[in-house]
Amino acid sequence: MQRKPFILKTIMAVAACKAVRAFLRRSGRGGGTALPGKVARKFSKQVLETTSEGMDIIVVTGTNGKTTTANMLETALTESGKDVLANKSGANLLSGVTAEFACAADFLGRPKKKCAVIECDEGALKQVVPEIHPKVILVTNLFRDQLDRYGEVMNTLKQIRTGVEKDPEAVLVLNADDSLVSSLGLHTPNRKVWFGLDMPVGDQSPRVISDALHCIRCGAEYQYHYYTYAHLGSFYCPKCGYSRVKPDFAVEKIDRMDADGSSVTFRIGSETRNVTVGLPAVYNLYNAAGAIAAYAAFGGKADDICRSLSTVHSSFGRMEKFDLPAATSKERAQQGAAASETAGTVPVRMILVKNPAGCSQTIDYLSRIDGDFRLVICLNDRTADGHDISWIWDADYERLSENTHIQSITVSGDRAEDLRVRLKYAGVNEKKVTMEKDNEKLLASMREGSLPVFVMPNYTSMLALRKILSDATGKKEFWEKQV
């Protein structure tokens, strides 16, 4: 007798979720990524557990790289013939995860797909894990992020640890080079799989303030055999002996790294192989290493994901490319520019930045670009971004002043003035810097000239700019690609 009300609640929750999402998308009010899940949970608190029951699930969490790593895993699983559920938009709170599973279920709330790759917010992990019972939990890294929401990084670590403890059966895939993430392997019964970089990268005198300067066990200052970036690297504590674990999956050598990707020598256990990663920058090597490790822990063949990494595409504002139509001769003449230039396309690359470590790594990536380009930096301080923007003073904007390929910098967003001040103190030539807060005018300025444009937005500014760039280039929204 108790089963009927439960089934009825599930049916109503799923129906409401699907209806709200359909309405939002058809009315042009967004992708329906979170609100449908909130509505569904009003009808049934068990709707997520019901609609995910029996599925094999990988959960990806951590400060940076969640969306990209999840995309790598989804691509590999799809290419291996599996029908995969994924929260492609990055809606990674409990409501967003609920919406994905409920909308993918049949009208009785039964899952129609066998497996899922879900990125999960660090703070939501403790809510999501006990409801979906993942087979694998991958933790990418831990950095300061949204200080007014999470507080300092140790609080974020505590929240992730609480989430991990909710499922002792899940395999933990951990970044061996991150002393904070690595500590999740202490005193947990879960099986652990480790990934990392077995080599130094870049400047061995880090220019970014460390988020993990002291040993998490005894408080002594860490020493390093080498750094990769920020506080990541081969760390060890000279006092208590806490140190980096030798990873099971690791990049041993970078054979090539350019603006479009990397070729590396990758170690899996005791064997090595050549792997091409179709996304650039050092942090994407970590994302790739984590994806390979998680794929193997999930039961997949490492060779399969190693092959798919060469063709993986950028996702939703993370190294995403747009071919923006250049201004026509008529438009240029109206704006007082030379009308003789041939209209074509302007390459635009969008790179989401939201904390000091990610921002500094993006600036490092820009230092590797051959040829001149224009730069746009956007900063909002809305709820989804975090209202505290003090982190921009810890990012390595000073390197922008050293980059002779940057021909102009446009600052935009709610806190554009703060960016302009930060660039001034970073030593950037003030004549190169302009401010444009109107997104339509910003788009028009991008279309002028032929130099490539790199855009560094934080989260809400990325959503706004991505929409106008998608409209201007005819790019479909993420849900329009789904069947």
PLM region spans:
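Glycine/charged-rich beta-loop-alpha catalytic/anionic-binding loops adjacent to active sites
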Residues: D56, T78-G81, I268-V277, D323-T328, ...
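ATP-dependent carboxylate-amine ligase
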Residues: M1-L24, G30-T33, G219, L232-S234, ...
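Phosphate-binding loop of NTP-binding sites
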Residues: K4-G196, Q204-H214
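Extended acidic/charged loop-beta regions that coordinate divalent cations
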Residues: C120-D145, L184-N274, P325-A326
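A conserved, hydrophobic alpha-helical segment in the catalytic core
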Residues: E131-N141, L232-K246, L279-V312
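Buried hydrophobic packing segments
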Residues: L73, L77, V97-F101, A288-F298, ...
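A short glycine/serine-rich beta->alpha loop
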Residues: D83-K88, N274-V282, V348-R349
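Residue-level signal for inorganic ion chemistry
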Residues: E119, T140, V173, N287, ...
